[in-house]
Amino acid sequence: MTVMQHTLKIRRPDDWHLHLRDDAMLHSVLPYTSRHFSRAVVMPNLVPPITSVEQCIAYRQRILDAVPQGHAFTPLMTCYLTDALSVDTLMHGQREGVFTAAKLYPANATTNSACGVTSIPGLYPLFEAMQQSGMPLLIHGEVTQADIDIFDREARFIEQVMLPLRRDFPELRIVFEHITTREAAQFVAEGDRYLAATITPQHLMFNRNHMLVGGIHPHLYCLPILKRSVHQQALRKAATSGQTCFFLGTDSAPHLRGRKESACGCAGVFNAPTALQAYATVFEEEQALQHLEAFCSLNGPAFYGLPANEAYIELAQEPASVVDSIASGDETLTPFLAGETLRWSVRA
């Protein structure tokens, strides 16, 4: 990393948690990732979900076909775990270089997770095979019981699922995705080299007051939901600490404006256009710019056993205005920090 007055040069980053959707939406949103990020772990929660090698190969090709000319971008594909998925399918996908990782959604925990897992113990044969092969398990870490408060679901997931899982599969490589609580940050920080976590820009910049005070702000609504300020501060401390177990994962999750601004709005923040600038802002505020490159560009590849990118990207302390909306077909998307002026600009 090179730091000059008002500029910062870092290895080109990767996004270790990304939703690209499909069809017209894919073509609308992909350029905002590929212009800043060299690789991204692409989530499999399409309708229907990506549960076979053939589906995954076809989806990967649709992504590659949508990459703008002049952009160098590699999608890293994932398999959607279900109660019925076989060990043979998962391991075949890994051997063929199709599945980089497997994604565990508890059933009905978030967008397009109805086909998700209903029994964690039922997946133990998959976890054993993944532990032996070194394949990472990516987890949306929330319990879904109706009697558990939505703000408590991540902390309860640690107690009910993560602790037994780590006990039973101590060398299974696990990414606790988009962590949102002090408990999760502490759990990962105290773990070993087989445990890591991604953190989103919205959970670093905002807490539930920002979403709910003065009216409901639907474009900050995501799952796991924003928590109290004490959790936000714990996440900021974790992300900027320099610990290698924490790395960038935007969880950029686009929805058309009409589906966000509705009586039953969808969960997800479309942050790809502004994520890198947002992370830089947080690290600057925490006086930790010296750790930004590791968080964005080094820790993730190291955990996945991949080389860091050789290309570089430059961030400059220059004001950048965020547009209010982005076209997607005949409708629009609202980007994270829409209408605001950012402190940082990216020179790709």
UniProtKB/Swiss-Prot annotation:
Q: Please list the residues that make up the active site.
A: 251
Q: Where in this protein does the record say N6-carboxylysine is found?
A: 103
> What does it catalyze?
(S)-dihydroorotate + H2O = N-carbamoyl-L-aspartate + H(+)
This enzyme's EC code(s): 3.5.2.3
Its required cofactor(s), as named, are: Zn(2+)
Give UniProt keywords alphabetically: Hydrolase, Metal-binding, Pyrimidine biosynthesis, Zinc
**What domain of life does the native source organism fall in?**
Bacteria
- Which positions bind substrate? 19-21, 45, 140, 223, 255, 267
NCBIfam families this protein is in? Answer: pyrC_dimer (TIGR00856)
Its function, per the record, reads: Catalyzes the reversible cyclization of carbamoyl aspartate to dihydroorotate.
The family annotation for this protein states: Belongs to the metallo-dependent hydrolases superfamily. DHOase family. Class II DHOase subfamily.
Report what the protein is called. Dihydroorotase
